[in-house]
Amino acid sequence: MENLSERFNVLQDQLMNIYEAAEHTLETQIAHWTLLRREAVLLYYARQKGITRLGYQPVPTLAVSEAKAKEAIGIMLQLQSLQKSEYASENWTLVDTSAETYNNVPEHHFKKGPVPVEVIYDKEPENANVYTMWKYVYYMDPEDVWHKTTSGVNQTGIYYLHGDFKHYYVLFADGARMYSKTGQWEVKVNKETVFAPVTSSTPPGSPGQRDPDATSKTPATSSDSTTRSSDKQSQQADPRRKGYGRRPSSRTRRQETQQRRSRSRYRSQSNSRSRSQSQTRALGATSVSRSSRSPSVTQIRNRRSRSQSRGRGGRGSSTDTTTKRRRSRSSSSNTRKRSQRGERGRGERGGRGKRRDRSSSTSPTPKRSRAGSRSSRQRGVSPEQVGRSLQSVSSKHRGRLGRLLEEALDPPVIICKGGANTLKCFRNRARHKYTGLFKAFSTTWSWVAGDSTERLGRPRMLISFTSTNQRKDFDETVKYPKGVETAYGNLDSL
């Protein structure tokens, strides 16, 4: 206990000497982080032994001490690597090498010269946000070579130059989604307007944007308003256009049913008249006179079923006129039944009945059954089809066998997104520790915009596998670094 307290006091004295000297050398900053690492390790050991206080200093939990020790080790290694570069002779302060500056955007980069950038949304000075643009940014390339670059700002955001590419670490559109109503912002640097109000290029349906039709709509003319009002009235008057909502009352439904029946009767009468007239013209004027009977008689006869008409037709008849009359009677009853079925389906089921009536009236189109396609897929995958599909497999409407056969069409991969140094360290560690759980690793790469040479998003890295089972074993075994995002995918060829 006393020995730990003495060591802790010695570390505190050495840290105070560094703070009082305030030297701007890289060697001093490395010594500072070395002392912080030793302090965190000592506090971790004290907590392990059950000690909760060293003098007047309370001992934090094991998790806090472990996190501080890892952070100190990481920054100390970066400073030691920077010491071997051409920038070791520059002035380095405690602020330049602090954990807050190192972890600020762009993350895990040493930065100097903060410049405030004010972004005003919707032309309201109260609705503003302040970002930090770093004058100089230090980064390491994939070959572990340090580079010093400058930052810039434009209407899109704040970026630093990574070679010939613009790497954005602040996008103003992200803030516009949260703070802006119109999607417009104005950029000011040192209280001077650099870019006039610009509009976000995000889709109109995204958060923080107004509907563009709301401001661009012009008053409609009288004819347009009349047409719209008539359409609304027709929609309200015809309940068949509504596929959902409340159903009308029983009295209203009875009236509508009676109207539909009268319409169907009138249509069946007209159809039967036209058919009977065309048939009886060849036979004579007798059938014409019989086909033009009063509507009441036709309605009564139309209520008879098809079986009754067939039964009547079974009896022998001596004249051709009676036979034609029975045919017209049965055809009119069939027409009435079809129309009643269609009208009843529209009234009771709304949109569904309408769609079914339309589908029954149109000519049938050949369709491939789902069961047939599924059975053909489950027969297997030919060797020449393996690796041809470029789309990821969906889990819907497929069993386990169908999903495995679909996945056999593409070589499986895992795409990792994160920092370039983090991905490289993970690749080197996995190659030695997880041999046999993967096929190959790719180098770190980035997407480039189609209309410029700017890098989009964080660096990527691909991991290929020989089968989905190998990818599953790799994903369940490997522990990915903090901040690394992963996603499954497939490629046509490797």
Swiss-Prot record:
Compartments where found: Host nucleus
Record bears the keyword Transferase: no
SUPFAM superfamilies: E2 regulatory, transactivation domain, Viral DNA-binding domain
Gene3D superfamilies assigned to the protein according to its UniProt record, in alphabetical order: 3.30.70.330, E2 (early) protein, N terminal domain, subdomain 1, Papillomavirus E2 early protein domain
This protein's GO CC annotations: host cell nucleus
Stretches for region DNA-binding domain: 410-494
Pfam family, one: PPV_E2_C
Keyword Repressor belongs to the record: yes
GO biological processes: DNA replication; DNA-templated transcription; regulation of DNA replication; viral DNA genome replication
Keywords from the named record: Activator, DNA replication, DNA-binding, Early protein, Host nucleus, Isopeptide bond, Phosphoprotein, Repressor, Transcription, Transcription regulation, Ubl conjugation
Gene Ontology molecular functions: DNA binding; DNA-binding transcription factor activity; nucleotide binding
Region (Transactivation domain) residue spans: 1-201
Post-translational modification: Phosphorylated.
Similarity field: Belongs to the papillomaviridae E2 protein family.
Function: Plays a role in the initiation of viral DNA replication. A dimer of E2 interacts with a dimer of E1 in order to improve specificity of E1 DNA binding activity. Once the complex recognizes and binds DNA at specific sites, the E2 dimer is removed from DNA. E2 also regulates viral transcription through binding to the E2RE response element (5'-ACCNNNNNNGGT-3') present in multiple copies in the regulatory regions of the viral genome. Activates or represses transcription depending on E2RE's position with regards to proximal promoter elements including the TATA-box.
Complexes and interactors: Binds DNA as homodimer. Interacts with protein E1; this interaction greatly increases E1 DNA-binding activity. Interacts with protein L1; this interaction enhances E2-dependent replication and transcription activation. Interacts with protein L2; this interaction inhibits E2 transcriptional activity but not DNA replication function E2. Interacts with protein E7; this interaction inhibits E7 oncogenic activity. Interacts with host TAF1; this interaction modulates E2-dependent transcriptional regulation. Interacts with host BRD4; this interaction mediates E2 transcriptional activation function.
Name recorded for this polypeptide: Regulatory protein E2
Native source organism of the sequence: Human papillomavirus 12
Name of the gene: E2
